[in-house]
Amino acid sequence: MIRLDHLPKHEDIQIYQDDEMFCINTDTMVLGEFLEVYKQDVVLDIGTNTGALMLYASLFNPRRLVGIDINKKALELAKKNMELNNVQNYELIYADGNTFRLDEEVDVVIFNPPYFKTPSKDLGNNEYLALAKHEDNFSLESMVNCINRNLRNNGTVYFLFQTSRLNEVIKLFNSKKLIIKKMKFVYDVNKDFSNVVLIKAVKGAKEGLVVEKPIIIDRK
């Protein structure tokens, strides 16, 4: 069922969501609030789904805003969401991140990727959620290759991933000279460990990492 919601922390920005697909959650919100984008930037959102992170990026009025996804139904909703909020200079492209290359290198890549290695039985036969949450068809290595292929030198990637797999991320990012410059761990108020971590990396940058104060999520 399609419903009309608003972007977390931005009640003036509305977004259509489909209960059968991946909907906005705290991961979306914390990554959206983590972004820094400039007006001259070309921004690429890999796996845009219904365009929530594109809407966050649009608040900075970038020169060009591109979202790609392999889910045509999600792209249709993303188009409605861009039009609903009068977003300018946007493009939505049906494409597979395993091979996608934009017609120019970009300044910023945004990515809230599928980060589970194996599908959950709870998803049943929901192909939309399987694509959004599990990396069967888009491995972590392929994700990093897609970022590297499209990001200019000194360009920035904003990324969110499972904390338990941080070593994998660091190894793969370093192999492509995507140097992690900032991290912020996200905690549930009721847990003693972090489930996800926000990452800012810069292609070809010098070493130097800042770990910011964590985000504590209270779901009440």
Model region roles, listed by residue range:
Residues 2-42, 48-60, 197-200, 204, ...:
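SAM-dependent Rossmann-like transferase core, predominantly class I methyltransferases
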Residues 10, 38, 60-62, 87, ...:
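Short, well-ordered coil/turn elements that cap or connect secondary structure elements
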Residues 14-16, 20, 24, 137-194, ...:
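Conserved Class I SAM-dependent methyltransferase catalytic core
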Residues 22, 26, 48, 65, ...:
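Residues at secondary-structure transition points
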Residues 30, 76, 80-87, 127, ...:
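SAM-dependent transferase fold signal centered on methyltransferase-like domains
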Residues 30-103, 108-122:
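Conserved SAM/SAH cofactor-binding pocket of Class I
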Residues 113-142:
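Mobile active-site "lid"/loop adjacent to the S-adenosyl-L-methionine
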